[in-house]
From Swiss-Prot:
Coiled coil: none
Keywords: Activator, Nucleus, Transcription, Transcription regulation
Signal peptide, first to last residue: none
Biased composition (Polar residues): 163-181
Protein name per UniProt: Mediator of RNA polymerase II transcription subunit 6
Region Disordered: start-end pairs: 163-232
Subcellular location: Nucleus
MF term (GO), any: transcription coregulator activity
Source organism of the structure: Scheffersomyces stipitis (strain ATCC 58785 / CBS 6054 / NBRC 10063 / NRRL Y-11545)
One Pfam match: Med6
Physiological role: Component of the Mediator complex, a coactivator involved in the regulated transcription of nearly all RNA polymerase II-dependent genes. Mediator functions as a bridge to convey information from gene-specific regulatory proteins to the basal RNA polymerase II transcription machinery. Mediator is recruited to promoters by direct interactions with regulatory proteins and serves as a scaffold for the assembly of a functional preinitiation complex with RNA polymerase II and the general transcription factors.
Listed Low complexity bias regions: 182-202
Length: 263
């Protein structure tokens, strides 16, 4: 356990808790069993003295209070109870006692339930937070670099890489172009301009529709020529037949007119 970092481990003694429990009166003794304890401290020396000497504790004073008062009278490294909140929380402070009124804090430890931890230093906390922030920032910058590409047509770096997919992947671009061309060739329709060779025929229900394509144009041209010939024949039959002006079957008879031929 000596090779491990003390701020990365936790320690507890279930045997001590089961036998004696844990309270403010014995919490320093419980802490002295942990690897965080310094056996060269004044606590260890004072405990050895109390073990082999008869100590007269003043009236209305607990052993823990008397022990803490004796520690303040000594100079050197000591462990004291800095804060307690029974029954499950204590803060043990390691400090350099200069005199009964002055001390320099060296390290804090806290006990939660039966577990003992070493409190991290401010330097370690800030280093960990800054390292985490820098790592996240680096990942974000790498992601932004992957999202942008340099294109001469854009005049610099651009986030719109969709329009440059054909440039980055020529094979895919060619295949896409072929598929688009095939689709347009199969489904696209355009209006055919009216010429003398492809006349537009007018039927009783409205103008006829002119379709594009070589086959359709040829069919329309053929049908247009046939229709033109039939129309010419009809006009010839209508206007060139010999219809008498007077007499049976004449225009005057069909219109029901009376004409005075003697005048």
């Amino acid at each position: 356990m000596s090779g491990e970092a003390l701020d990365e481990i936790q320690w507890k003694s279930p045997e001590f808790i089961q036998e004696r429990g844990l309270h403010t009166g014995n919490v320093l003794e419980y802490f002295s069993l942990s690897p965080f304890y310094d056996r060269t401290s004044n606590n260890q020396q004072l405990m050895m003295q109390f073990q082999f000497q008869q100590i007269q504790i003043p009236v209305n004073t607990t052993f823990q209070q008397f022990f803490q008062e004796k520690l303040r009278e000594m100079t050197g490294v000591v462990f004291v109870i800095a804060y307690n909140r029974e029954p499950d929380f204590w803060i043990i402070r390691k400090q350099l006692q200069l005199d009964p009124q002055n001390a320099v804090t060296l390290q804090d430890y806290y006990i939660i339930g039966a577990n003992v931890y070493q409190a991290p230093k401010v330097y370690d906390v800030l280093s960990s937070r800054l390292l985490s922030s820098v790592l996240q920032l680096r990942n974000s910058i790498d992601l932004l670099n992957k999202m942008t590409q340099f294109h001469v047509s854009d005049g610099g770096h651009s986030y719109n890489n969709a329009i440059h997919q054909s440039t980055s992947n020529p094979t895919q671009g060619q295949s896409s172009g072929k598929s688009i061309s095939a689709t347009v060739g199969n489904t696209g329709t355009t209006a055919t301009p009216m010429t003398m060779q492809t006349p537009q025929t007018v039927g009783p229900n409205g103008p006829a529709t002119v379709q594009s394509g070589a086959n359709s144009a040829a069919a329309i041209s053929k049908n247009g020529s046939t229709s033109s010939a039939e129309s010419a024949d009809d006009r010839k039959n209508i206007y060139l037949d010999d219809i008498p002006l007077y007499g049976r079957g004449s225009t005057v008879e069909m219109l029901g007119l009376k004409v005075n031929l003697e005048s």
